[in-house]
Swiss-Prot record:
Disulfide-bond pairs as recorded: none
Any single Pfam family the record assigns to this protein: Chorismate_synt
Protein name per UniProt: Chorismate synthase
Residues binding NADP(+), per UniProt: R49
Record text on cofactor binding: Reduced FMN (FMNH(2)).
Keyword Lyase carried by entry: yes
Pathway assigned in UniProt: Metabolic intermediate biosynthesis; chorismate biosynthesis; chorismate from D-erythrose 4-phosphate and phosphoenolpyruvate: step 7/7
EC number: 4.2.3.5
Organism of derivation: Synechococcus sp. (strain JA-2-3B'a(2-13))
Taxonomy, superkingdom: Bacteria
Reaction(s) catalysed by this chain's protein: 5-O-(1-carboxyvinyl)-3-phosphoshikimate = chorismate + phosphate
């Protein structure tokens, strides 16, 4: 865990591989046994994040076909580590020769060199978004566990590209609406404007950033482990570990700071199924614990660092120079970041679901009388 390549407590994932190495992949440890699982379950999610899927993504062509090497037998998980491998087939390390000695502005080149004294400059190595293949593969397993165990649905979409903002109701948006266009924005009018902006940036050799919003529905109450492992804290860490992420907010987020307590509080009311909240400014989490309402969060992604426009930079030996980067890169990471965000949210929720049942769901203590609060004295 100290090396930063593993994530999770009970549902633990470890990713490996580099952008232009032989393969990338993941080992998932802690998956419950007897879960029906096939390569097709994982492939469906990998296809959503693979490169070359549309004119507004990187032109790199990778099939990203997954292989399950262990942990599954006759279509069911064994409860042992699951190893998933994806081979790289369209690597072009020669496109990155200049990066061997020149740092890309706002990229991990300089900081990896400063930390390790060595780096894989071919496509960014571990700093490449290609590392997220392992996350998405593991997220596919987590999604299936959540769906079968609790009916949880996780759905992300592009909410903003640069200054083009979509109008989306997270409580009613559907997967069909998200996947209806190449930018993965469920607002058709905004999607058309976003695509135009991305195409313009690509023609100019530049890039754009924006915001991905994610909703998790039917999350059981009680997930989260205060005080240091609050659910929103782990969600923030998860999505902020994604490449190019620069901001996180949940529920009302920063906008909530403009409200009073009376305006912001989510009032309770009773239904036949128990208590609910009339609003959801808490974003489905109170006190670090899920409250049963939709979990709604947003992640800000910066513009892609590697661009064809000339930029001032320095070399490995300290010389100032100008770099116009080559290689194949997304002019905007957001369309492919959608399944990445979903995967990281799924990993957190699955881990906390298992942790909750381990702590609170295994022992029956109904025979033990609970203390009753004494009535106040008159």
């Amino acid at each position: 865990m100290a090396n930063g390549n593993s994530f999770g407590v009970l549902f633990c994932v470890t990713t490996y591989g580099e952008s232009h190495g032989g393969a990338v992949g993941v080992v998932v440890d802690g998956c419950p046994p007897r879960l029906p699982l096939s390569e097709a379950d994982i492939q469906a999610e990998l296809d959503r994040r693979r490169p070359g899927q549309s004119p507004i993504t990187t032109p790199r062509q990778e099939a990203d076909r997954c292989q399950i090497l262990s942990g599954v037998f006759q279509g069911f998980t064994l409860g042992t580590p699951i190893h998933i491998l994806v081979r790289n087939q369209d690597a072009r390390p020669q496109d990155y020769q200049e990066m061997a000695t020149t740092f890309r502005p706002s990229h991990a080149d300089a900081t990896y060199q400063a930390k390790y004294g060595i780096r894989n400059w071919q496509g960014g190595g571990r700093a490449s978004a290609r590392e997220t293949i392992g996350r998405v593969a593991a997220g596919a397993i987590a999604k299936k566990i959540l769906r079968l165990a609790a009916g949880v649905e996780i759905l992300a979409y592009v909410q903003r590209v640069k200054d083009v903002e979509a109008q989306v109701d997270p409580s009613s948006v559907t997967a069909e609406q998200v996947e209806a266009n190449i930018v993965r924005c469920p607002d058709p009018q905004a999607a058309a404007a976003m695509i135009q902006k991305i195409e313009e940036a690509a023609r100019e050799g530049d890039s754009l950033g924006g915001v991905v919003e994610c909703v998790a529905r039917r999350v059981p109450r009680g997930l989260g482990s205060p005080v240091f492992d609050k659910l929103e804290a782990d969600l923030a860490k998860a999505v902020m570990s994604l490449p190019a992420s620069k901001g996180f907010e949940i529920g009302s987020g920063f906008a909530g700071t403009y409200l009073t307590g009376k305006q912001h509080n989510d009032e309770f009311y009773m239904t036949p199924g128990g208590w609910r909240t009339r609003s959801n400014r808490s974003g489905g989490i109170q006190g670090g614990i899920s409250n049963g309402e939709d979990i709604v969060l947003r992640v800000a992604f910066k513009p892609t660092a590697t661009i064809r426009q000339p930029q001032n930079t320095v070399t490995l030996n300290g010389q100032e120079t100008v770099l116009a980067a080559r290689g194949r890169h997304d002019p905007c990471v957001l369309p492919r970041a959608v399944p990445m965000v979903e995967a990281m949210v799924a990993l957190v929720l699955c881990d906390h679901l298992l942790r909750h049942h381990a702590q609170c769901g295994s022992l029956v203590l109904s025979e033990v009388p609970l203390p009753v609060a004494a009535a106040p004295q008159a």
